[in-house]
From Swiss-Prot:
Its main location: secreted. The lineage of its organism: Bacteria, Bacillati, Actinomycetota, Actinomycetes, Mycobacteriales. This is Chaperonin GroEL 2. The gene is groEL2. The keyword ATP-binding applies. One of its GO terms (cellular component) is extracellular region. It comes from Mycobacterium avium (strain 104). Keywords: ATP-binding, Cell wall, Chaperone, Isomerase, Nucleotide-binding, Secreted.
Amino acid sequence: MAKTIAYDEEARRGLERGLNALADAVKVTLGPKGRNVVLEKKWGAPTITNDGVSIAKEIELEDPYEKIGAELVKEVAKKTDDVAGDGTTTATVLAQALVREGLRNVAAGANPLGLKRGIEKAVEKVTETLLKSAKEVETKDQIAATAAISAGDQSIGDLIAEAMDKVGNEGVITVEESNTFGLQLELTEGMRFDKGYISGYFVTDAERQEAVLEDPFILLVSSKVSTVKDLLPLLEKVIQAGKPLLIIAEDVEGEALSTLVVNKIRGTFKSVAVKAPGFGDRRKAMLQDMAILTGGQVISEEVGLSLESADISLLGKARKVVVTKDETTIVEGAGDSDAIAGRVAQIRTEIENSDSDYDREKLQERLAKLAGGVAVIKAGAATEVELKERKHRIEDAVRNAKAAVEEGIVAGGGVALLHAIPALDELKLEGDEATGANIVRVALEAPLKQIAFNGGLEPGVVAEKVRNSPAGTGLNAATGEYEDLLKAGVADPVKVTRSALQNAASIAGLFLTTEAVVADKPEKAAAPAGDPTGGMGGMDF
């Protein structure tokens, strides 16, 4: 495909036009009085959202240079969303301000590399200041306030705070669509995984279609169980102990399954067989998690243990096990708390070292099952369009609340960034680097000014008033009052604020140091087929 090339100012201005087109669509959503954006979908109903990254993903521009500029800013929003779960609109507004001021200085003759170094040093200083000023999140109310700011709804904030209170900071909180109107919270005690009983004959509660085992032994096997002679010695010992048995194995089939079912129907012995979750190495790891949680051991040839020689001491224990056709829940496993803590620490290390989003997500799920629990928020709404928008807001708010617990909170509403400006005076920079720091100084006011503008206030007046206020005091755009924002519950996770700034600065540096842009040349649409003489081709008169 043929390429088109732009140089110098033409290249940079083309990229900036694309950035502005995207940023102008995104920034109208910033703050409590921000508006929504309607996104047309090729199929189905349109989506209504105020989420920066969702809007950014939908924008495709026609001009090749503008398209590249927009793609670069999409990367800012996506990276911020990946790291912090929120702050995508703030990141876009900061990127726009940094690029605008930066290009103005480049056009005036400043060295782009000097500006880039100055911007990087200034951002590092501001990040350090933000982290120092962050307050730890200690109360349920603080979590609720932070989540409510993200979702724009206090009831959502309260529900997320309750969910985190129940499952712990490491617990998994998932959001599901509900057929009923409103919000509901469902909690899962202990470890739950998505595998149910192998045979319906194991059911103990016909009405609920559940198999419930009280105080059972738990047999964990890494291979298939098919012959009854392998299982019999252990079964006899369990029957003598007078307890039910849960078997979790790669599969239970043939004679072994028949024997268990027949004994269950006759009332001789209560048991349930379940397939182990996952595949390959992940299955082995999850079985090991269950072994540590229940105080048992995985029967595996790899560690020199076989089923026929297994002893009752290798079995795990739990207070209760509930098995449905789709899932199994182990409540209060009898594992050693130190061993569980060690396993949790090991999984945390694996999460930090993993560079795959999918692996990280699966490790996080394992961590939650061991360390906390699982909470499901069920969201309902009057229409499908509203339901999707609400679900998305709740998911963002959950990640926001977790980010707040992780690194602490700072004053929201763009105030923390503006109040970090004096820290730049400590930098002793000269020449173009000093100019780069001044670009950051101007850009740090942009989020507050945009929030004020969206709230119908004069941005310059608001910025001046906040600049002269004590640290942490600023505009509460929801009420129009100037107050201590942390006390008023207007807080942002510092992780969100710093990620937005760092990612915006990264892309701004690329914009400023760009000297040429190579893009695909737009193809001209082919003329419709027809008779070149103007008649109807192929017709005979």
